[in-house]
């Protein structure tokens, strides 16, 4: 936990337990439910490695369901682990931000677990801009109208309550609320989630065109499953 007066940051992954039938069901078909769970586990492992590489921040996972703690303790034994609290995604985001701010962190960045090809540079940029005076909110927009990252310098529950989650209206509504609250907003580059069959093919194509081993767990899964 940060000492009094010390500026500290935390990057936490919003994650689900990689259980068959509970994750990535929109990828079935082309995947089976077991394959979808294995793919999501690969996404998680890659995101954990990516977040762990951020030396300027503490690292956490907000997990669901509550009984999944042992799974995440095995996947990321060095991470802060907390259960997600609340009904919809908005309430869970509010509770997760509240938990970390209560722990004394200066800024909190929450990232999704559906963007295995997201460049680490984007997360480094988020840590840079959240530390700048005048930045209250950092958003990493997703192509589907949501966001892959949201960061705050103080709890702002009004940003998340009553938002039409899982629709293309999430980002516009969040932006409108931030403007109404007078918040200074910093933007990251747009990126894509992997939720559907076409998304998976796009991921496969983008990784095939990209040099380097990362994201290594996702690459291993895709290499073992011909397209």
Label every model-predicted segment.
Residues 157-175:
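Short, glycine-/small-residue-rich phosphate/pyrophosphate-handling segment
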Residues 111:
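Catalytic metal- and UDP-sugar-binding loop of GT-A-like glycosyltransferases, i.e.
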Residues 118-144:
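Conserved donor-nucleotide/metal-binding helix-loop-beta segment in metal-dependent transferases, i.e.
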Residues 2, 173-227:
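Conserved alpha/beta core of the MobA/IspD/sugar-nucleotide pyrophosphorylase nucleotidyltransferase superfamily
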Residues 1-26:
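N-terminal nucleotide-binding beta1-loop-alpha1 segment
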């Amino acid at each position: 936990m940060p000492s009094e007066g010390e500026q500290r940051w935390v990057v936490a992954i919003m994650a689900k337990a990689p259980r068959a039938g509970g994750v990535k069901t929109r990828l079935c078909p082309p995947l089976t439910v077991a394959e979808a769970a294995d793919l999501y586990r690969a996404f998680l492992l890659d995101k954990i490695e990516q977040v762990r590489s951020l030396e300027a921040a503490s690292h956490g996972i907000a997990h669901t369901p509550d009984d999944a703690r042992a799974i995440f303790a095995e996947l990321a034994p060095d991470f802060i682990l907390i259960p997600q609290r609340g009904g919809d995604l908005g309430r869970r985001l509010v509770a997760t931000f509240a938990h970390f701010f209560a722990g004394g962190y200066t800024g909190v960045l929450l990232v999704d677990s559906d963007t295995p090809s997201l460049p680490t540079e984007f997360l480094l940029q988020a840590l840079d801009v959240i530390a700048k005076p005048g930045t209250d909110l950092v958003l990493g927009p997703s192509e589907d109208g949501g966001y892959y990252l949201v960061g705050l310098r103080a709890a702002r529950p009004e940003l998340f309550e009553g938002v039409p989650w899982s629709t293309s209206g999430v980002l516009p509504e969040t932006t409108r609320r931030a403007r109404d609250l007078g918040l200074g907003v910093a933007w990251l580059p747009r990126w894509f989630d992997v939720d559907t069959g076409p998304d998976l093919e796009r991921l496969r194509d983008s990784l095939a065109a990209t040099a380097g081993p990362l994201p290594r767990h996702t690459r291993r899964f895709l290499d073992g499953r011909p397209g």
